[in-house]
Amino acid sequence: MELNSLRPALGSTKNRKRIGRGIGSGHGKTATKGHKGQKARSGGSIKPGFEGGQMPLQRRLPKRGFRPLDRNEYVLINLQQLDVFEAGSCVDRDAMNAKGLLKKSDLPIKVLANGDLTKALTIKADKFSKSAIDKIQAAGGKIEGISAC
């Protein structure tokens, strides 16, 4: 066997369909488009969503709601999740990431007051709820962050 005598396995390759190249090719004359009709014309494709003149589904269904362009999205962290840290430790983005608390680490963090905090922690976050601030301070912890809402 030599490299110049290698051939693809039988049935593994197909010949390209050359349309409009004479009746001997089997794909001449109408070039596989059939006779007349919309699909035989140039530019005769039917647009996506067209239902033959019936009111299309995307126009039959009502419009609903909107998404505000200036909406701020936060990663929400509850106090009960922060209770896994040791007392006196500093809890910031890196520490939360290490414990697997942040799914989307690029978003700002907001601390909510769900659950109880039993240890004094120094928590660094972008936002805190008022009740979360009260609970953290009641447990003897400190808050470091951009703002408290």
Curated annotation (Swiss-Prot):
This is Large ribosomal subunit protein uL15. Part of the 50S ribosomal subunit. Residues 1-61 are annotated as: Disordered. InterPro entries: Ribosomal_uL15, Ribosomal_uL15/eL18, Ribosomal_uL15/eL18_sf, Ribosomal_uL15_bac-type, Ribosomal_uL15_CS. NCBIfam families: rplO_bact (TIGR01071). Binds to the 23S rRNA. Belongs to the universal ribosomal protein uL15 family. The gene is rplO. GO terms for biological process: translation. One of its GO terms (molecular function) is structural constituent of ribosome. It comes from Trichlorobacter lovleyi (strain ATCC BAA-1151 / DSM 17278 / SZ). Residues 30-39 have a biased composition (Basic residues). GO terms for cellular component: cytosolic large ribosomal subunit. Keywords: Ribonucleoprotein, Ribosomal protein, RNA-binding, rRNA-binding.
